[in-house]
């Protein structure tokens, strides 16, 4: 991704097109499949590293996962505050449901795709074959990484005042406020709020409420299997009053 690309994304969503550290944004687009692996790990798995072709990027040292971790927290806080202001008469249960609907990976992955972020995703050939570039869960991670980069980049700004109050009180700069403007503009441009309010597709929550109401118990959830790229693959089993052994899915 280029400086002009980043500036265009920022200005499209109400943020000044000023980039202080382009490398943060470049890092945000590096999937872990395109990073260098430890030599010992390659030897153990009999992986032979070929020379990089002239028309390919060199493998990167670090992926976007630390930025994703940061962006996830920033997005969570911004979304909660946005819902708190948008729905002043709703209770915390309603806001929690809508927050889950907004920030789940598939939802923000859809936003990332509509924004065109997938075009700059740096992934391996194997990941490309597994259609990671259009995998909404992975694009959700990409969105969070970009947001983490934006947050850090605008924290580079120092705010001075005569009494040095900003310097003594705030650990960060205005990165959160800039991220807030960015996310809220995206919500306003891409989210169908009428559909979001009417629909409740949190099927796990619907089932749990019914089970708790009728049987006075809370279900236990068991992870069936997990693929690092594809995510969770879960069979659905309901067990009331007895243990299930030897599950297949």
Model-derived features with residue positions:
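Double-stranded RNA-binding/processing signature
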Residues: 1-249
